[in-house]
């Protein structure tokens, strides 16, 4: 809804931005936003068919070619805490065996789906790591991703009812909302931006990701604005691409005012509830000014 204010000779308009820039495509963001939805294209583009594919890729990139059989993925499988998979040493064959649960009715439900020779010691094949990751549930994969060194990852929730809105904490209505993905920054991304990683830096990154989600939510909820500034009937300045609460937009507009314009013009902005035609509005102002000038003193 447009807003207008006049302090002669200036008139200020704050207007809806009908062609706003997508902050996930057009802004320099620290985090990457990976989402899945049947009707909406959200966040950055990606090629992951399912959330588990994304999580497996993060873990494979972190631990492949490291040839360390004591990495967190193998340690988790050895602990017996995984729901449907475990990693065990077979003394007879001298192999490490990945066993998976077929969900039948006895101990025979567990079968060997993959193995590698213990003689390789720490030279664990990457294909075996891939097999192990494929045996884990999405929840187990996410738990391991959270433990990655230097990783900051936050869930993304979408509420879809007469429009869409997004946050990182979830919504109270389970029928119209649910998790659609994550926003994350890994160790390499954080080091490139901040250098050495410390607990304070990780908290700063978390706050940055929260702010990026909030900015994207402004875009999704059409809280996108621009302004046009006129001196009498001549446009002297304009700017578009403001995202945020209207109060924040008003504060940002103050920075664009000419020196001879009273900043109070921003505080005097009023919503226009009828359709606004700027040319007609300015013409009407001019007529009113001329009428006042013609009145006998």
Language model features with spans:
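Acidic interaction surfaces
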Residues: 1-297
């Amino acid at each position: 809804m447009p807003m207008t204010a006049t302090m002669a000779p200036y008139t200020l308009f704050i207007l809806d931005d009908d062609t706003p820039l997508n902050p996930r495509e057009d802004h320099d963001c620290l985090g990457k936003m990976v989402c899945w939805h049947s009707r909406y294209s959200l966040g950055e583009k990606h090629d992951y068919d399912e959330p588990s594919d994304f999580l497996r890729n993060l873990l494979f990139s972190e631990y492949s070619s490291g040839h360390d059989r004591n990495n967190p993925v193998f340690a988790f499988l050895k602990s017996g805490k995984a729901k449907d998979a475990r990693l065990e040493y077979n003394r007879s064959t001298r192999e490490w065996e990945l066993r998976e649960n077929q969900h039948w009715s006895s101990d025979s439900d567990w079968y060997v789906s993959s193995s590698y020779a213990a003689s390789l010691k720490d030279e664990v094949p990457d294909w075996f790591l891939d097999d192990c990751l494929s045996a884990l549930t999405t929840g187990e994969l996410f738990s391991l991703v959270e433990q990655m060194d230097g990783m900051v990852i936050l869930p993304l929730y979408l509420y879809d009812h007469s429009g869409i809105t997004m946050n990182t904490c979830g919504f109270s209505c389970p029928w119209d909302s649910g998790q659609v993905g994550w926003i994350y920054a890994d160790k390499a991304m954080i080091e490139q931006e901040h250098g050495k990683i410390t607990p304070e830096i990780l908290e700063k990154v978390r706050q940055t990701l929260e702010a990026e989600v909030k900015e994207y939510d402004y875009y999704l909820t059409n809280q996108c604005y621009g302004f046009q500034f006129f001196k009498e009937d001549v446009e002297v300045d304009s700017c578009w691409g403001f995202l945020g609460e209207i109060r924040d937009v008003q504060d940002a507009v103050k920075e664009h005012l000419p020196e001879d314009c009273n900043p109070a013009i921003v505080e005097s902005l009023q919503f226009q509830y009828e359709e606004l035609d700027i040319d007609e509005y300015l013409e009407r102002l001019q007529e009113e000014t001329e009428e006042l000038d013609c009145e006998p003193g």
